[in-house]
A protein has these predicted regions:
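C-terminal, non-catalytic "cap/extension" segments appended to globular domains
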Residues: 1-133
């Protein structure tokens, strides 16, 4: 359900202003967006619809729901690092403190992520594994 909501969110965010459907066509737009990514199940309606997300889609917060899922990707990658290095290993904790926590917003956030994980970019398989896929 979260992946479906994320895909709907991204589909809306990618529209130009001239392509935004009228309110009476929003449900059809959602179904098409889900169909395009293989998440449309006509037997089970989506739990979340566009109208449910006014708090994240209103006020210039485009693709806001997507950011929730992206945060999970980053968190799952960091959790994987802790699992590989030893969550209780003092060096791992100090490394996280030095390379992530102490930086705050003083360094590019993706560089901070890379500095700690050693990954050039986040690995989405960590999210899939965390979700049992």
């Amino acid at each position: 359900e979260n992946l479906g909501a994320t895909c709907i969110d991204m589909a809306w965010a990618m529209l130009s202003s001239k392509d935004i459907p009228t309110a009476d066509k929003a449900a059809a737009f959602e179904q098409q967006a889900l169909k395009e990514v293989g998440l449309l199940d006509t037997q089970i309606p989506p739990r979340y619809a566009t109208s449910y997300f006014n708090h994240v889609w209103g006020g210039g917060y485009a693709a806001g729901y997507y950011s929730y899922l992206w945060t999970e990707v980053l968190a799952d990658n960091i959790a994987t690092c802790f699992a590989k290095r030893g969550a209780l290993d003092p060096r791992t904790g100090q490394d996280f403190r030095d390379k992530v926590l102490s930086r705050g917003n003083t360094k590019d956030l993706m560089q901070t992520f890379t500095d700690f994980t050693g990954l050039k970019s986040p690995d989405t398989s960590a999210l899939l594994k965390a979700r049992g896929m």
